[in-house]
From Swiss-Prot:
Keyword Magnesium annotated: no
Coiled coil: none
Gene: plsY
PANTHER family per the UniProt record, alphabetical: GLYCEROL-3-PHOSPHATE ACYLTRANSFERASE-RELATED, INNER MEMBRANE PROTEIN YGIH
Domain of life: Bacteria
Associated pathway: Lipid metabolism; phospholipid metabolism
Statement: the UniProt record of this protein carries the keyword Transmembrane helix: yes
UniProt-annotated location(s): Cell inner membrane
Assigned protein family: Belongs to the PlsY family.
The protein, known as: Glycerol-3-phosphate acyltransferase
UniProt KW keywords: Cell inner membrane, Cell membrane, Lipid biosynthesis, Lipid metabolism, Membrane, Phospholipid biosynthesis, Phospholipid metabolism, Transferase, Transmembrane, Transmembrane helix
Amino acid sequence: MLDVILVIIGYLIGSISSAIVVCRAMNLGDPRQGGSGNPGATNVLRLAGKVPAGITLLGDWLKGTLPVLLAWLATEDPVVASAAGLAAFFGHLFPVYFRFQGGKGVATGLGVILAWSPLALLATVVTWLAVAGAFRYSSLAAVVAFAMAPIYMLWLSASPVLTAATAILTAAIVWRHRENIVRLAAGEESRIGSSGS
């Protein structure tokens, strides 16, 4: 029963949209109605600048990390920790509080990976930074970094359970970025720092 409660808590925490909460609190409007329409830190950066985007990023990151840490502390079971992390992640993608219309999951996914394996998180972030720095596309950096994340998890945690859970994150993030991938292929994707959608 505790396992189920931890998973439900993870989903409910993940369903809190940091972008919407931050933008409402700062009277910045609804991020779903401007820019790319995605309620995430990158779109908040485009619409409102670095400070609101930074707060959004931190909120999205923490809501991935905290449910996993709670599950580790309560059970010390990697299966429960994996389930709680995935619940938080899918809560971000499909939030019950916002008609199941959520973000793309990058920051929350990174927060989950942090709690699963800090070393795998470090490798994933370094990959994101390298790709983003070289090409200036946030979406490309996210797809490449998460494509590598299961490999990093297997290498650095040696946990088949956590590796499988990371692969699920990867598949979902690639799917959520499918429109970005089409725009990248067409040369129409907005670069980091641009004001486009």
